[in-house]
Regions:
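A short, small-residue-rich loop immediately preceding and capping a beta-strand
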Residues: 31-32, 110-117
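Glycine-rich beta-strand-to-loop/alpha-helix junction loops that act as flexible
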Residues: 82, 115-120, 307
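Nucleotide donor/acceptor-binding cores
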Residues: 110-111, 135-137, 181, 276
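Structural beta-sheet core signal
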Residues: 115, 139-141, 173, 280
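Short Gly/Thr/Asp-enriched flexible loops that form oxyanion-binding sites at enzyme active sites
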Residues: 120-131, 220-229
């Protein structure tokens, strides 16, 4: 243990630094001590229990879950919201709010930002703050439009346009569907100048915001609204766990070819993986296998989810 003079000095430095908010340089000048000595004595004060730092985890009760999921899957960022006792709409709104804060924090001037479709992505876009000034962002869809009658608020073009308006960015929209009747039609659209313009942005994507689908929810209204009458019986037979932008994968993250693959117009997963940030937003036990597959395949490097889903991911 230090002698009494050393302890008195450590206490004095700690009081100036932590309670009076003086910088280490200011303390060094006031006490006539090298700044490196100030730093060393502050560390010694913490190590010996002279100084203790308390964090009020009531403000983020899910921090442990976030850290564990981040470490387990090697992610860049994780946001876990509470709400296990809340209804689904409330939990989704909370995910949208905190996801919007994450996206806004990660964006850099000049970024190309890609959007998929769906309820979760819509919840995030709705909660984006109105930008005070432009960051010269370019917002683009990374999948075509629905085959069925999807609610406009979940449509990829609606989300892309709305996000660009809030972020004071530039938007480009998709005038092609995600699923075509046959590969010949798809290949023809891929030769169009419009598609080439959109796909060029996919090649240089900086940030992506995606929902995660699962065959477990294919009886839901939004699945039918997006895919229309497209045959999907082969998904279970091929052990599909989930999809991002209608690109299907198994629970290990390996891509799975389906009868839709050659008729799909959306970003390819190798391009999605090249983005600086690929943010997945999803929750629920039904989507668990899809989320796990997306994480294992490294198709996303950031995750926004709820606490019950995060707990499942750690089992």
């Amino acid at each position: 243990m230090e002698n009494s003079d050393d302890i008195r000095l450590i206490v004095k430095i700690a009081q100036l630094y932590y309670e009076q908010d003086m910088t280490q340089a200011q303390i060094a000048r006031e006490l006539g001590i090298y700044r490196t000595t100030i730093s060393r004595l502050l560390k010694r004060g913490r190590d010996q229990g002279i100084v203790t730092i308390a964090i009020n985890y009531d403000y983020n009760e899910n921090l442990w879950l976030e850290q564990q999921v981040k470490q387990k899957f090697g992610l860049k960022d994780v946001v876990v919201v509470s709400g296990n006792d809340e209804d689904e709409d409330t939990q989704l709104a909370m995910m949208g709010l905190h996801g919007a804060q994450l996206l806004d924090r990660l964006l850099e001037p000049g970024d190309i930002v890609g959007f998929s479709w769906g309820r979760a992505v819509s919840a995030l876009v709705e909660n984006l703050p109105q930008a005070g000034q432009s960051r010269q962002l370019i917002c683009v869809p990374i999948i075509g439009g629905p085959s069925g009658k999807l609610k406009s608020r979940y449509h990829v073009n609606t989300l892309t346009y709305s996000a660009a308006a809030k972020l004071k960015g530039e938007s480009h929209l998709a005038d092609f569907p995600a699923l075509l009747d046959n590969p010949l039609i798809r290949n023809g659209i891929m030769q169009s100048q419009h598609f080439k313009t959109i796909s060029a942005y996919w090649d240089n994507l900086d940030v992506a915001l995606v929902g995660i689908g699962s065959p477990a929810i294919r009886d839901g209204a939004n699945w039918h609204a997006f895919y229309g009458g497209e045959e999907s019986d082969d998904l279970n037979a091929r052990q599909v766990a989930g999809d991002i932008c209608s690109r299907f994968f198994d629970i290990h993250g390996a891509m799975v070819e389906t009868n839709m693959s050659e008729k799909t117009l959306s970003i390819e997963m190798n391009k999605l993986k090249q983005a600086r940030y690929s943010i997945g937003i999803a929750m629920s036990e039904e989507k668990y296998s899809g989320i796990v597959g997306a994480l294992r395949g490294k198709y996303i490097n950031c995750l926004v989810t709820n606490s019950s889903t995060a707990e499942l991911l750690l089992k």
